[in-house]
Design a protein with these regions (language model features):
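Active-site or metal-binding loop neighborhoods of secreted/extracellular toxin and effector enzymes
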Residues: 5, 9-14, 18, 41-43, ...
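Extreme N-terminal leader/targeting regions
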Residues: 2-61
C-alpha cells in the first residue's frame, strides 16, 4: 500500500483517489456513464434476487450474510453515489466489519480500523456496492489481491451481482487503456469494462463473473 498525498485528487481516467494526510487505501469504482442510482426495492426483495446468492459460495451461512448485507446496503444507499462495504468470515458467515458511513462518493477509504481488522483475520470475503452499477473495477481486483481476500462481491444498484478473485496485481493503466479502446469501438461503458476485464483475465490470474439466480 502506498502513501497518499495531502491534496485530494480524484483522477477519473485512472480510477485513483488521494485523500488526506493519513496512510489510506481504498476501493474506488471507475466512474461510468450510468447516473441512475435508485434501487428497485421490489426486485431486491424478490425471490429471484435472493436466489442469486444461493450458490455464491459453498457456505450457506456466508451466502445468507452476503444476501442480508446486500439488501441492507442497497436500501441504505438507494439514490446516492455512496458505497457500503462488509467483511465476512468465509468459514462462519459472521460479518466481522461493516462500513456504512462513507462520505466519499463511489469509494471506501481503508482507515486504521479497517486495516487493523483485516490484518488479524484470514479467509475474508468482501461485499460492497456500486452505485453506477458497473462491474468490479481494477482497483477492486488489486485490493482483493493486496489484502489477501478469498473472494469479493459487488452488489450493483440495478440488481446485478458480480463476484471476483485476484491472485496477482494488475496494471490499472492497461485496464483503462482497454476500456478506452472498447469504448472507441462502440461499446457502452458497462460493455467496455466487461470486455476489458475479460481481456485482463487472459493475461493475469484474476476472474470476474456475474452471479445469476437459479431457475
Amino acid at each position: 500500500m502506498g502513501k497518499y498525498s495531502k491534496a485530494v485528487d480524484k483522477n477519473e481516467k485512472y480510477g485513483i483517489m488521494n485523500v488526506g494526510s493519513d496512510d489510506v487505501a481504498l476501493e474506488y469504482q471507475r466512474y461510468g456513464r450510468n447516473k441512475n442510482t435508485l434501487v428497485n426495492s421490489t426486485y431486491i426483495e424478490s425471490g429471484e434476487y435472493r436466489r442469486k446468492f444461493d450458490n455464491a459460495t459453498d457456505n450457506a451461512e456466508v451466502n445468507k450474510a452476503l444476501y442480508d448485507n446486500a439488501k441492507k446496503a442497497l436500501r441504505h444507499r438507494s439514490g446516492t453515489a455512496f458505497e457500503d462495504m462488509y467483511w465476512i468470515d468465509s468459514n462462519t458467515g459472521k460479518t466481522i466489519l461493516a462500513v456504512e458511513d462513507s462520505k466519499e462518493e463511489r469509494a471506501i477509504i481503508y482507515n486504521e480500523r479497517i486495516m487493523k481488522t483485516i490484518r488479524n483475520e484470514s479467509d475474508i470475503i468482501t461485499l460492497h456496492t456500486h452505485p453506477s452499477s458497473m462491474p468490479p473495477s481494477a482497483s477492486d481486483l488489486n485490493s482483493c489481491f493486496r489484502n489477501g481476500y478469498k473472494k469479493g462481491f459487488v452488489a450493483c444498484h440495478n440488481g446485478r451481482v458480480f463476484g471476483y478473485t485476484a491472485n496477482e496485481e494488475i496494471n490499472e493503466r492497461i485496464y483503462n487503456m482497454y476500456v478506452e479502446r472498447f469504448t472507441k469501438d462502440g461499446y457502452d461503458e458497462f460493455g467496455a469494462q466487461m470486455r476489458a476485464l475479460n481481456k485482463l483475465s487472459q493475461t493475469y490470474d484474476v476472474s470476474v463473473w456475474e452471479v445469476l439466480h437459479n431457475e
